[in-house]
């Protein structure tokens, strides 16, 4: 009888371990339900984009309003993307930026973008991936930023087709980094969002849902 009980216990333990391995581990940067976490910091490049936490379409989100301005919110975090390779978020824009053009400095403005910043001991060699809602760039295209080749722009959305609706994005940061830089990624040190219109002088509005970081199941 004791042997039978031990076998049953071992069976349930193995079942629990198996089930836990089938589910991804998750980190939520900020669920936004208590306002903006103090872990978010703002960096201004020209003026200030207005960021506020609101409830829109029955979901908590960060609203961004830019008027010829460029500032971003960044969230410092230290993790290995090999352990947590997936990043997901939802976003929505009111409209694209008509003069936006990812291939020129004059058009380097985006209704919405999400940055992933990678660790470097030399700050001038810091690399970043920018997931952008582009205007003209074909969806899925990778190009260097018009100001620095250390930042790669990836057009996960492009054009006005999906403007006005929530879009859920899911990216494998490890795969994107390898495709962008031809190497394995170092640790990630920050994730940021930015809506900017300083180069074009236009206006833009966007909404960002909570950002989640996931392991693979």
Annotate each predicted stretch with a short phrase:
Residues 107-151:
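Extracellular/luminal beta-rich ligand-recognition
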Residues 32, 191, 211-213:
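Extracellular beta-strand elements of beta-rich domains used
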Residues 76-87, 160-163, 184:
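Extracellular/lumenal carbohydrate-interaction signature centered on repeated Trp-anchored short motifs
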Residues 24-45:
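Extracellular carbohydrate-recognition regions
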